[in-house]
Regions:
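LysM (lysin motif) carbohydrate-binding repeats in extracellular/periplasmic proteins that recognize
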Residues: 209
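Catalytic cores of secreted/periplasmic lytic hydrolases that degrade extracellular macromolecules
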Residues: 1-198, 202
Length: 209
């Protein structure tokens, strides 16, 4: 799901920038249509951030409040998440948001609307509804180690598949008939005598047993 895919990023950004993970995830869900919007799919733009005057990266043109508006385009979703945090962190109109506790998602939701992030009057209500429906507030209380352990778990989850594949190859190799090795022949007269003596003893054991 979208939440499972991007929760780690949201928590990482929370500890880097101070933006609540719940707010980041809720905005991502809402703005990107659960990751299925044209901006998200073609431009990795999960937050509907427009170009503005100082943007020097990739661009996409999309009909929003006005026709053919310029939106930022990113090489990856990770860069979209990072830019979203910095967009809020370094713009004066959003500075007051960082006076709220990271767990106060309701104040953050209303503050985003007040600062002009969205024109929809129901924007705060939509964010809060998403946060409470999916219990996104739980991510606001995750320790910093959550992101690292989650990434490690995902890497470990991928390893068994490769291991099973390797074992399968080994089984297929050993399944082929293997020829028995030919008996090693003695290379010297002494070895010949030893073999003959051993053969005679074995014969005697067989005869008198």
């Amino acid at each position: 799901t979208y939440i499972e895919q991007f929760a780690t990023l949201a928590v990482e950004e929370m500890y880097r920038s101070g933006v609540p993970a719940s707010i980041t995830l809720a905005q991502g869900l809402l703005e990107s249509g659960y990751g299925l919007s044209e901006l998200a799919v073609k431009g990795n733009n999960h937050f509907g951030i427009k170009c503005h005057n100082n943007w020097k990266g990739g661009r996409m043109y999309y009909d929003d409040d006005r026709k053919g508006e310029c939106f930022r385009k990113y090489p990856s979703p990770e860069q979209s998440y990072r830019d979203h945090s910095d967009f809020l962190r370094y713009r004066d109109r959003y500075k007051f948001l960082f006076d709220y506790k990271v767990t106060d998602y309701k104040s953050w939701a209303h503050g985003l609307k007040k600062a002009g992030y969205a024109t929809d009057p129901a924007y705060p209500k939509k964010l809060i509804n998403l946060i409470e429906t999916y219990e996104l507030y739980e991510y606001d209380r995750k320790p910093a180690s959550f992101a690292k352990s989650d990434r490690k778990a995902k890497r470990n989850h991928e390893k068994p598949a490769r291991k099973v594949k390797e074992e399968k190859v080994k089984v297929e190799k050993t399944a082929d008939p293997v020829a028995e090795p030919e008996p090693e022949l003695p290379k010297s007269p002494n070895e010949i005598e030893q073999v003959e003596a051993l053969t005679n003893e074995q014969r005697q054991d067989f005869q008198f047993s």
